[in-house]
């Protein structure tokens, strides 16, 4: 594979959904507010269009972030003039809002007005559309209860409150989707028992494990949204790489702004240790023994009643790291998988009778994995029987033994069509042929393709 192809594949695999799009008319408070959201486990995209004083198209990266976001926060201040970049971006944000794909939350740092007189005089041809957009933004402040007028109030406290409210919107908007809710009650009942939230005499640590794409992170984020209000500090770590070195460095760092800019969650975690606070810490994607052991050792310094959850594909890693209990997130049961697939393929809980046999084949092809069920169901939605038969045969032949990597690559493509699916499969095939397969990769592939179906029989 060429270096360009390798880079493209890597970027696709690393692509992540954005929860909240941040658009500020000035740089005031934007870094502080972004850090609050990140500490609440919210994935953000911070736009710097406010710095642009000339006209220019919205970049593809910015557009993609808007398409993926559930919420856009637009922060304004009368003490700072609105820039061309901010106003042009606002027009695009409101287009997404009018289509119903984006919730817009205005935050007024001073009062319900805007510093735009000078820029409107400079660009009279754009002034009408800009003023209309700003009027819509003002109206949204009354329409949405999360919007706040911060004039004369303590901005720090209110920004923290808004961040907490946004976290509920983000987490629960996903939970209201039948795809997210399926099997969640079953998982949560066991996890609640393991967490034993009523016990405040110790720091409890649990591990959540399972194959790639089975829904470990979805479950962890659901847990986070359900219980974070019970803790003084709460942190959801998407990336624990080099966590030990970074936190040890932050322990001796006197300037908290350096801590936050270097590692968004480092300050919260070290403060919880220093001040013996009750913390909820969830660490996703723990993939080596040193990471797990060090997190468990570090957690001993938190206040009694704290809860630490480690997420990994490797059960032995979690046990050897020293977690008290482990829970396996298995692939969906047959009826659950069929319900998730039908939601995306037919917009109803179960398939029509004339598509039932094909739907069952598709569920097996997706490996009972939520990610695969969503992508394959969305792709087949609206197609006729002949198209289903042809697509399922072609996908089964093309899929080979690396279903999870193909699903991840497919998830990152804008158009979930068969051509893009085949391209993703080709990338994985070339990647595998250009390197030796490690024992771990073979085990993961076998678990996904074979073990999943056998696990269904055992449940």
Curated annotation (Swiss-Prot):
The residues covered by the TIR domain are 16-170
Keywords on record: Cytoplasm, Hydrolase, NAD
InterPro entries named among the record's database cross-references: AAA+_ATPase, Apaf_helical, Disease_R_plants, NB-ARC, P-loop_NTPase, TIR_dom, Toll_tir_struct_dom_sf
GO cellular-component term (any): cytoplasm
Which Enzyme Commission number(s) are listed? Answer: 3.2.2.6
Reaction it catalyzes: NAD(+) + H2O = ADP-D-ribose + nicotinamide + H(+)
- Sequence intervals crossing the membrane: none
- What is its EC class? hydrolase
Q: Where is the NB-ARC domain?
A: 191-401
- Gene3D superfamilies, sorted: Helical domain of apoptotic protease-activating factors, P-loop containing nucleotide triphosphate hydrolases, Toll/interleukin-1 receptor homology (TIR) domain
Keyword Hydrolase assigned: yes
Query: What tissue specificity is annotated for this entry?
Result: Mostly expressed in leaves, stems and roots, and, to a lower extent, in flowers and siliques.
Residue ranges, compositional bias (Basic and acidic residues): 429-440
Q: GO terms for biological process?
A: defense response; signal transduction
A single MF term (Gene Ontology): ADP binding
Q: What is its main location?
A: cytoplasm
Highest taxon above the source species: Eukaryota
Q: Which residues form the active site?
A: 89
Q: Where is the stretch described as Disordered?
A: 429-459
* Pfam families, per database record: NB-ARC, TIR
Q: Where in the cell is it found?
A: Cytoplasm
The record's domain comment reads:
The TIR domain mediates NAD(+) hydrolase (NADase) activity. Self-association of TIR domains is required for NADase activity.
Name used for this protein in its record: Disease resistance protein CHL1
Lineage runs: Eukaryota, Viridiplantae, Streptophyta, Embryophyta, Tracheophyta
């Amino acid at each position: 594979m060429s270096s360009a192809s390798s880079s493209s594949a890597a970027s696709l695999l690393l692509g992540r959904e954005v929860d909240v799009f941040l658009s500020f008319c000035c740089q005031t408070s934007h870094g502080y507010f972004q850090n609050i959201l990140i500490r609440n486990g919210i994935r953000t995209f911070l736009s710097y269009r406010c710095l642009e004083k000339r006209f220019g198209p919205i970049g593809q990266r910015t557009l993609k972030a808007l398409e993926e976001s559930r919420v856009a926060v637009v922060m304004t201040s009368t003490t700072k003039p609105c820039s061309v970049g901010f106003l042009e971006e606002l027009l695009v944000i409101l287009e997404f809002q009018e289509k119903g794909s984006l919730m817009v939350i205005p935050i007024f740092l001073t009062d319900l007005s805007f510093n735009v007189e000078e820029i409107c005089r400079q660009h009279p041809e754009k002034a009408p559309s800009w003023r209309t957009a700003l009027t819509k933004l003002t109206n949204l402040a009354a329409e949405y209860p999360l919007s706040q007028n911060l004039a004369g109030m303590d901005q720090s406290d209110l920004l923290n409150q808004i961040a907490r409210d946004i976290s509920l919107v983000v987490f629960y908007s996903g939970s209201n989707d039948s795809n997210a809710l399926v099997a969640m009650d079953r998982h949560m009942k066991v996890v609640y028992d393991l967490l034993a939230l009523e016990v405040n005499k110790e720091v409890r640590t649990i591990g959540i494990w399972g194959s790639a794409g089975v829904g470990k992170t979805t479950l962890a984020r659901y847990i986070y949204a359900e219980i974070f209000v019970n803790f003084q500090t709460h942190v959801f770590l998407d990336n624990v790489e080099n966590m030990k070195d970074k936190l040890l460095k932050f322990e001796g760092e006197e300037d908290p702004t350096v801590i936050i800019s270097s590692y968004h969650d480092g300050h919260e975690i070290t403060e919880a240790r220093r001040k013996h606070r009750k913390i909820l810490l969830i660490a996703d994607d723990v993939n080596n023994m040193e990471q797990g052991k060090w997190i468990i050792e570090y957690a001993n310094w938190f206040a009694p009643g704290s809860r630490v959850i480690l997420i990994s594909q490797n059960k032995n890693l979690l046990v050897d790291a020293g977690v008290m209990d482990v829970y396996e997130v298995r692939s969906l049961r047959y009826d659950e998988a069929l319900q998730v697939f039908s939601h995306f393929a037919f917009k109803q809980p179960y398939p029509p009778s004339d598509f039932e046999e094909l739907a069952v084949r598709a569920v097996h092809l997706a490996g009972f994995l939520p990610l695969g069920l969503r992508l394959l169901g969305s792709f087949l939605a609206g197609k006729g029987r002949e198209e289903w038969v042809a697509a399922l045969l072609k996908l089964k032949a093309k899929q080979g033994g690396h279903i999870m990597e193909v699903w991840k690559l497919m998830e990152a493509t804008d158009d979930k069509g068969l051509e893009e699916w085949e391209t993703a499969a080709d990338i994985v095939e070339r990647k595998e042929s250009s390197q030796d397969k490690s024992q771990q990769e073979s085990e993961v592939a076998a678990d996904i393709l074979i073990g999943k179906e056998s696990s269904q029989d055992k449940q």
